Design a protein with these regions (language model features):
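Short Fe-S-cluster ligation motifs
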Residues: 60-66, 78-88, 101-122, 288
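N-terminal [4Fe-4S]-dependent radical SAM core
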Residues: 1-69, 75, 84, 108-112
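Auxiliary Fe-S-binding modules of radical SAM enzymes
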Residues: 1-20, 214-288
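Conserved AdoMet/S-adenosylmethionine-binding subsite of the radical SAM
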Residues: 100-257
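Flexible, glycine- and charge-enriched loops at secondary-structure boundaries
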Residues: 50, 92-95, 187, 191, ...
Length: 288
């Protein structure tokens, strides 16, 4: 038995946008970046059971029991009023799962999926749980066919990647800007460790995808197209580059006033990369 626990915000039994094929997508709670453009800002913080959200719930689905927020999923209508009021950018609707409980859920859908993707928040903040979960999948005869992917911001240390590498099939990493200055403006943290993670993962054939989020007038990919292209080309020819288009849906604060990226802008960035021999590029199917 494995009783190691993790705080989980959401589980999607079937996802076609969180890696190749049909996947079980698990979103862990907590993030160490503070991205202005985050579409899931309620996954950033950890609930401290302050109780401020209880009175805001129109369905009275929240209560405080023994100093801990209790969420009644049957009464909840997913209106998100509570998370919009949370001062910690958290959610009272998170649940705690053990490795064994999550394996049971995985087994339920195993015949219908190609693999699992653990995202967030930032999934690697709960690294011991992640290692045990992936290890359990690889050791189970009826689950070991599933690929185990991590969707990460790349801030994990190289020592951390070395610990989980034997049990994962790859990681999808976001490079939110090229320059450190722009990255700090967008996320609150430097991108130096992220670049090191990307290089290490590529060298060990574990970089499943490199993601670039284009935000008009905010990201600096085009201004730094030469060093960016050189960096991408140094990763090897088999690395998929996924250009995502920023849209305003789900964001808060100043990013709500930022312009959404359009198809012309994404194609322009794609063409500039192709001119510099970056060829394996995915672009959005839909623009908002």
């Amino acid at each position: 038995m494995n009783s190691r626990c993790a705080s989980i915000n959401k589980i999607l039994p079937f996802s076609c946008v969180d890696g190749p094929g049909n996947r079980l997508a698990i979103f862990l709670q907590g993030c160490n970046l503070r991205c202005k453009n985050c579409h899931n800002p309620y996954t950033m913080g950890i609930c401290d059971n302050c109780g401020d959200c209880i009175a805001t719930c129109p369905q009275q689905a929240l209560s405080l029991q023994n100093g801990v927020i209790n969420w009644n999923a049957d009464s909840c209508e997913q209106c998100d009023t509570c998370i919009q009021q949370c001062p910690r950018q958290s959610s009272p609707m998170t649940l705690t799962y053990t490795v064994d409980e999550l394996i049971a859920i995985t087994r339920k859908y195993a015949a219908f999926i190609n693999g699992v993707t653990v995202s967030g928040g930032e999934s690697t903040l709960q690294l011991p749980f992640l290692i045990d979960y992936f290890k359990a999948i690889k050791e189970a005869p009826d689950l070991r066919h599933l690929t185990c992917l991590i969707d990460s911001n790349g801030t994990l240390s190289l020592n951390g990647w070395q610990k989980i590498a034997p049990f994962m099939d790859g990681a999808m990493i976001d490079l939110k800007s090229w320059s450190e200055e722009t990255h700090i403006y967008l996320t609150g943290r430097s991108n130096q460790r992220i670049k090191k993670s990307i290089k290490w993962l590529s060298e060990h054939n574990l970089l499943a995808e490199l993601r670039l989020l284009y935000i008009p007038e905010k990201t600096d990919y085009l201004e730094n197209i030469e060093p960016l292209s050189h960096f991408i080309n140094s990763l090897g020819e088999s690395i998929t580059i996924h250009i995502n288009a920023f849209h305003q849906h789900g964001v808060y604060g100043e990013a709500k006033n930022w312009r959404s990226a359009n198809k012309e802008q994404i194609i322009n960035l794609q063409n500039e990369l192709i001119l510099r021999k970056v060829n394996l590029i995915k672009t959005p199917n839909i623009y908002t």
